[in-house]
Regions:
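Alpha-helical transmembrane segments and their membrane-interface junctions
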Residues: 256-271, 335-355
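Short, highly charged, low-complexity non-transmembrane loops/tails of multi-pass membrane proteins
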Residues: 314-319, 386-401
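Hydrophobic, small-residue-rich membrane helices and short re-entrant helix-turn-helix hairpins
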Residues: 17-27, 107-146, 223-245
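C-terminal membrane-solvent junction of multi-pass transporters and transport-like membrane proteins
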Residues: 11, 25-28, 32, 242-247, ...
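Membrane-helix boundary/coupling elements in multi-pass transport proteins
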Residues: 101, 106-115, 194-237, 293-300
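Hydrophobic alpha-helical segments and their helix-loop junctions in multi-pass secondary transporters
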Residues: 34-81, 147-157, 293-310, 340-347
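Membrane-interface loop-to-helix entry segments
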Residues: 2-68, 107, 131-138, 286-294, ...
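TM-loop-TM module centered on a large, flexible mid-protein loop between adjacent transmembrane helices
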Residues: 68, 74-82, 131-215, 235-282
Length: 401
């Protein structure tokens, strides 16, 4: 809990300094993390499985008190947990079932779309498009290269089984602790190929800078939403107050930090909510990013017909596919993919993902959050109506910049 409080303090200070200061922190953290990843990849590229096994045995015993033979014992524990996913091969059907896992991970690089409005040149849709596309393509390529390097030195078999053994115990499916009691962090495992504790520490510290650069983004996007809601009169005007020098929305930050402390406490100590440990309740949280995109996709499909004047005045209007608006064609394709993903995640007919309707508490929690948002809006609408303000007109159409 102390670490959480310190991180919240760090994030609050950095964001309170303003966008320019946070951008510098993020840029520095990004490149330090990249340097750490590059070193990890070099050790995986030039290392060997024999060196990794020897390093694992030595470090797991010294650092985590593991018994001798941790490599073989970890594979056995993972197999007992049911880890059978290969790195290569598989039928087309199996590949499609793997997509929801991959997209669940890849939703996060695209999550930056919520902040693209604050990027210089955001009014040029081509910059937004290229920014999102490059982020996804680069992330995917790095993941592929990294998996290949992991398979070369650590082996995919060990990595997969180590995770299965760890999470099988972590989520309470077995009472027997895994041979490797620490989470099998790939960077940590890669650095086991060196016997230098100083080098291990420096590289892992460098990799951790990604977290410091990313952590502020969670509050940055959320505080901007809270600020916008106050600016549009859904929340009290005081919430839109900004600090004169940094122009940071101070009260919006407070509305994030205080609930953040409460949620962190519930998560760290896994307090029961809806009869289930809070950690399990959060499993469906990433899913709502896809739900948000689905709503935007439907709006994009209908835009050329529902808001024809607005559409024809936009740069995207000149792009057609077989005479049809490109935005609608792309929207139908992407929308169908999102519906497939949401079906697999929520219905989960093959019991693969653990975040759907079978995880009743998690889905209920997400539903309560949506319901809370509706209640806040309806209450605000009633209050503002009494003040002579029609919120319906405020949200009917976004004004042109």
């Amino acid at each position: 809990m102390l670490v959480t409080v310190l991180m919240l303090g760090f994030v609050s200070v950095v964001i309170a300094l303003g966008m320019k200061a946070y951008a510098q922190v993020q840029k520095f953290s990004f490149w330090v993390g990249n340097a750490g990843l590059a070193v990890v990849c070099l050790f995986l590229l030039f290392g060997s499985n024999q060196a990794f096994r020897a390093g694992l045995e030595a470090n797991a015993t010294k650092l985590f008190g593991a018994a001798p033979g941790v490599y073989d014992a970890t594979i056995a524990a993972g197999q007992a947990a049911g880890a059978i996913t290969p790195l290569f091969g598989g039928t087309l059907g199996v590949i499609f079932l793997a997509m929801p896992y991959i997209v669940f991970f890849n939703l996060w690089p695209n999550w930056g779309a919520t902040l693209y409005g604050e990027v210089k040149g955001a009014d040029d849709f081509r910059k937004n498009l290229s920014g999102m596309a490059y982020a996804l393509i680069l992330t995917t390529l790095l993941a592929v290269v990294f998996f290949i390097l992991v398979n070369k030195t650590i082996t995919w078999d060990f990595m997969n089984n180590a995770n299965a053994a760890y999470w099988n115990y972590r989520w309470g499916y077995t009472t027997e602790a895994p041979p490797l009691v620490a989470w099998p962090y790939p960077a940590m495992l890669a650095m086991f190929t060196t016997s230098s504790p100083i080098l291990q520490f420096v590289v892992l510290l460098a990799m951790s800078f990604w977290f410091f650069g990313w952590a502020g983004t969670v509050f940055l996007s959320s505080t901007r939403v809270i600020f916008a809601a106050a600016f549009d009169r859904v929340l009290p005007e005081a919430v839109a107050t900004v600090e004169p020098r940094s122009r940071a929305p101070i009260w919006a930050m407070v509305l994030m930090v205080v609930p953040g402390l409460i949620v962190s406490y519930l998560y760290i100590y896994n307090k029961p909510v809806f009869g289930t440990g809070f950690a399990s309740i959060t499993l469906a949280s990433t899913l709502v990013i896809a739900v948000t995109y689905l709503g935007s996709t439907i709006a994009a499909i209908l835009l050329p017909w529902v808001k024809k004047d607005m559409y024809e005045a936009s740069p995207i209007a000149k792009y057609k596919v077989l005479g049809l608006p490109a935005i609608s064609v792309a929207g139908v394709i992407f929308g169908a993919f999102l519906v497939f993903l949401l079906y697999q995640w929520l219905i989960d007919p093959n019991a693969l993902y653990g975040i759907g309707l079978k995880n009743t508490a998690s889905v209920t929690f997400m539903g309560v959050m949506y319901l809370l948002a509706v209640v806040i809006y309806l209450v605000a609408m009633a209050v503002r109506r009494g003040q002579g303000v029609d919120l319906g007109k405020v949200y009917k159409e976004i004004p042109a910049e």
